[in-house]
């Protein structure tokens, strides 16, 4: 008998396969029906959610999420309590795909009570629900488990909802550094100016990673109030923070930062020097005069990065000074000047 290949026949063939005595055949059927996204399969897949084989149940949970029929929500909520962890995770993932409000409390419970893998899965699912989940997440910010607070902060940041801003600002003072770090990231994602002063304060946090994320958040919010505190933070003892500060000052593009950034061209860490040079490039033409002057700086690093940056800005005023720099006693400066002159000609 010739194999049937039209869509209707494929659907019927795979629906029949769900009744096969072989678990692998039933599993393949759930995968095929999920890929078809045909709502006629929902009833059969709901039955497969109760299959004796855990792989088939997991496949059915996945397929129901792919099809996207809201009638599957109650059964998937029930499957969150399945005895097999992978079935539970599959159900949580599909509830996230369906983004139904009825799933909020089961997903919150999965976030709170699951192992690391389940918590991560529930976190991703909650991200899909958007604004309806915010109130529940705000409650989790005071949970006794720092990991729960951390995940709630992460999801709230991803929603970009300004309603979360004030509670997230409070988490900048959390006893756990991972939560403080996540709060800084989240506030940067939301980009609300009410977070500027608290983030400036976070530049003094005892943990370097919190300070670094505060620089990134301030860069995303782009408020001029942060320029002076960021300049001060260019002297932070941790190079990662200094690098973050340089990037932030580049985003803010304030000429006030030109001199401090030029000094940072002599930082002991190359990444910071590169960040400072890139920031000066972002500031652009207002930085040209100072960069030209610093082609005579005692530090070879400053001369080298000044030449490099002048090439990136492409201001013809720098040409004759770069030609002179070709005679610099440092070969690195000579090379940077040569490259910069080539860029000026482009």
Per-range role (PLM):
Residues 1-8, 24-38, 47, 54-70, ...:
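Structural detector for internal amphipathic alpha-helices that build alpha-solenoid repeat scaffolds
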Residues 12-19, 23, 43-50, 74-81, ...:
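HEAT/HEAT-like alpha-solenoid repeats
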